[in-house]
């Protein structure tokens, strides 16, 4: 009879089986029959093990209280080839501007974005959808029923945020003469993710 897998192995297997959707904290607590503190300990240990294993192409992340196994940044080039698109390509200034508007004003329609920017945003919107950073989330109850756009979990992952609450507070920059890049990828990529959630 094979011995029962460790809790860490069970966590890894569950997240692998869950795929892109991942598993929420409450589901993992029930499935693994452990406490929130024990889950955090397991998650941090698994995260460190994957990070320190040069032969592993996976990483563990937690976004909006949902744990996921994803491919590591170091494997980005080969994954890009697989999907035949360059996920590491920098976003244009207009795309970042639109992404900022959606992040802070979501859900929002294209017309509302156009009104704020003063120019047509259709092309950049499609790029952001294609890149998986935004998605359509229903339609606005007005004539024409335009699509409503919101950011995705991949948006949080891409910029190394754990939730929308981590976005900079706009008021903090109102008195600052220096321009602020809300999505400074170099700065965000240096941010260490910790799984210390509130119990």
Swiss-Prot record:
Keywords: Cell cycle, Cell division, Chromosome partition, Cytoplasm. The keyword Cytoplasm applies. The keyword Transport does not apply. Coiled coil: none annotated. Homodimer. Homodimerization may be required to stabilize the binding of ScpA to the Smc head domains. Component of a cohesin-like complex composed of ScpA, ScpB and the Smc homodimer, in which ScpA and ScpB bind to the head domain of Smc. The presence of the three proteins is required for the association of the complex with DNA. Participates in chromosomal partition during cell division. May act via the formation of a condensin-like complex containing Smc and ScpA that pull DNA away from mid-cell into both cell halves. HAMAP family: ScpB (MF_01804). This is Segregation and condensation protein B. It comes from Lactobacillus gasseri (strain ATCC 33323 / DSM 20243 / BCRC 14619 / CIP 102991 / JCM 1131 / KCTC 3163 / NCIMB 11718 / NCTC 13722 / AM63).
């Amino acid at each position: 009879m094979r011995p029962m897998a460790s809790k860490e192995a069970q966590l890894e297997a569950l997240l692998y089986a869950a795929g892109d959707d991942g598993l929420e904290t409450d589901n993992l607590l029930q499935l693994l029959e452990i406490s929130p503190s024990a889950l955090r300990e397991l998650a941090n240990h698994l995260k460190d093990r994957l990070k320190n294993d040069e032969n592993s192409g996976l990483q563990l992340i937690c976004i909006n209280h949902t744990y996921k196994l994803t491919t590591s940044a170091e494997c980005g080039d080969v994954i890009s080839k697989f999907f035949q698109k360059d996920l590491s390509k920098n976003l244009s200034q207009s795309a970042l501007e639109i992404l900022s508007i959606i992040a802070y004003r979501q859900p929002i329609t294209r017309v509302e974005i156009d009104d704020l920017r003063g120019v047509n945003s259709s092309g950049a919107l499609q790029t952001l959808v294609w890149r998986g950073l935004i998605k359509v989330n229903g339609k606005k109850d007005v004539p024409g029923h335009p699509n409503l756009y919101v950011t995705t979990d991949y948006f949080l992952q891409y910029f190394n945020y754990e939730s929308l609450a981590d976005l900079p507070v706009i008021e903090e920059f109102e008195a600052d003469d220096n321009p602020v890049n809300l999505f400074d990828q170099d700065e965000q990529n240096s941010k260490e993710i910790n799984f210390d959630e509130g119990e």
